[in-house]
Amino acid sequence: MTRQILVGGVPIGGGAPVVIQSMLNTKTTDVEGSLRQIRALAAAGCQVARLAVPNREAARGFAEICKESPLPLVADKHIPIRIGVNGGSLDKRLLEKYGHPTAEALVESAFEHLELLEKQGFYDTCVSMKSSTVPTMVAAARLFRSKCDYPLHIGVTETGPVKQGLIKSAMGIGALLLDGIGDTIRVSLTDDPVQEVYAAKDILKAAGLRKEGVNIVSCPTCGRTRIDLIGLVNRVDEALRDCKKPITVAVMGCVVNGPGEAREADIGIAGGDGWGMLFEHGQQVEKLPYEELLPALLRRIEAM
């Protein structure tokens, strides 16, 4: 088990639940804009927000933001200290030693920074070692964890377009979480930071580390499908994105196999040719016209 630190009132490490982070893409000098984004992140489920503080003007903005932020904030200079090692900014000496940003180079850089802090008697530190290459990031985190117990912030950086970023992040973060490695995570996307939070929540749910929120299961469609299943699944996902009930909802493409295949779901819908059924634990509850399926599902979930 890792040692524990506190960021504001949020515990990181020491057996605490994995914490979701995101980073603002506003200018820290834009106090009101930054606060709006922080509030949106908090509403989505973010627990810690990071801001860039590159100069004194930004530091003044950061101070104002701290006064009203509903979330603990992390900046370049903040307590507790976060050591962030990135493959794109390694010391030239380490690049010459290892040839390129290897996992070993990232870990050695992290330990060099930790040693500087430990010599000053400071141990309240969280460490991050990120790479845009999934195997390198995973190997670095595993190597670091085998050597010490500082809490780890994990994530893949510079992940590319959103679809690629989601896959890379799910692979890298998910592999480590299933190994029991990782105390706080960020899914880095070239997108609205709120989408990073939703993705992080989905990864934690898929890894079995977070029960809060809806788990949607749906079939991949086949020749029996007689409804717009893709559109229906997307509408269900959008409608239930902020639902905090720990339930599994099935959206199936046919009434022949759908309810049986999704019998483990708490509730679900299956479509036929112009009609469909609402079911719970594989048993039919109601037969409905297709256009009434989604409203009926949402009403039933609301009443659960």
Which ranges hold each PLM region?
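N-terminal amphipathic alpha-helix/helix-capping segment at the start of soluble metabolic enzymes
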Residues: 1-23, 32, 238
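Active-site mouth loops of central-metabolism enzymes
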Residues: 15-33, 52-54, 73-75, 94-107, ...
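Conserved, mostly hydrophobic/aromatic
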Residues: 20, 76, 83, 127, ...
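Glycine-rich, proline-tolerant flexible connector loops at the mouths of alpha/beta enzymes
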Residues: 25, 30, 42-71, 125-134
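Catalytic alpha/beta core domains of metabolic enzymes, predominantly
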Residues: 85-89, 94-244
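Hydrophobic alpha-helical bundle architecture
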Residues: 232-263
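Terminal leader/tail segments of proteins
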Residues: 263-264, 270-274, 283, 288-304
